[in-house]
Amino acid sequence: MCALLSVWSQLLTWFAPNARHHRNATPRILVILLSEMGSVVLAKAMFDTLKAKHPGVDLHVLQLKKNQGVMRLLGFVPEANLHSLDDASLGSLLHDLWHTTRTLRALQLDGVMDCELFSRISALLSYACGARVRIGFTSHTQEGLYRGSFINAPVPYNTYQHISLQFVGLAKVMEAALTWSAAQLNDTTQRPLTRFLMPAIQQSLPQLPVDTAELHAFHARLQVDFASFMGNPKRVLLYVSGGALPIRAWPEDSYIALAKTLIANGCAVGVIGLPEDTPQAQRVLHAVNHPRCIGLTGYTRNLRELLMLFHNAELLVTNDGGPGHFASLTPIDVIAFFGPETGRLYGPISDRATVLESGMACSPCLTAYNHRDSFCDGDNQCLKVITVGEVEKLVLHKLQLT
């Protein structure tokens, strides 16, 4: 489909090079951020750049329906400008593809930014929405990542820059591309389009404001439901699950050993996660077998409550994934394990976060270039070699217990 659409796009370039596109007085831009919730947090600088460069910009966002909670909470765009695709079933996905595409085309967009690295579905959507300027990542001459040639402002993906900076790069290209003529958009001699200096990566994201009354109410609820946990001043949260990619998880036995050490040092431990993570959490609780080690999987009913839970703890120990990024919006300290992917590209943006990586020769092995297909097949030695003793020492230091 990408190849066919590329041929069609090229034919239009040849036979209708000066086709008119509606231009809005204030730019109307669509951002495609389908897949991971944590990426929304890392995209904050990109949204800030778009708003700074285009005052009054009419921003729209397309996401998977299940991932929209973060965008709603952060409020980067108005609720009415959030568009979704429901991938719960093939039928619902096809239904939303049809109706959402029609809605987006009716908006008469000036530009679209595809933040999905080398996803073909997002590339197709960027063309289908009808925007004149189409910005997305390109593999250039690298093989195996083909997704067509209809993205008329392609940006090279840089494996040496944090993804938040690469998102900013897309926004800076949009600033220039919106002023270009059709001939300039098709002028390949000007590429790569990212020949400009990048800002330094943010050291820390600003904390998300939380309503004081709401925070007090959640604190009181915790005190009623988990008195032994809340009665301890040294509260530590563990995210044991690997989420959609279990290969990113530090071993369960290591978490159990860490929890036992924390209990022995007088701390309280809460195991967090989604409701489907409960069986794994119960195994940890059973192994630790102490009243100060509690299960919190499924306890928070939404992302806002998860952030309030972070406000009620001192430290989060987590695998690579959403919780570490969400925690960067709160005062909690974070220790995050990376290995199959690297914190140099995807680490939390927080001066309170510490990334632990073993530095194994094959790490990272999950990349945009191999469609996140690892050699290890579940045997993530890069995480297994991170010792419990090493983590214990860091945790106790952060808790000021050493």
Predicted regions and their residues:
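Catalytic machinery of carbohydrate-active enzymes
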Residues: 1-402
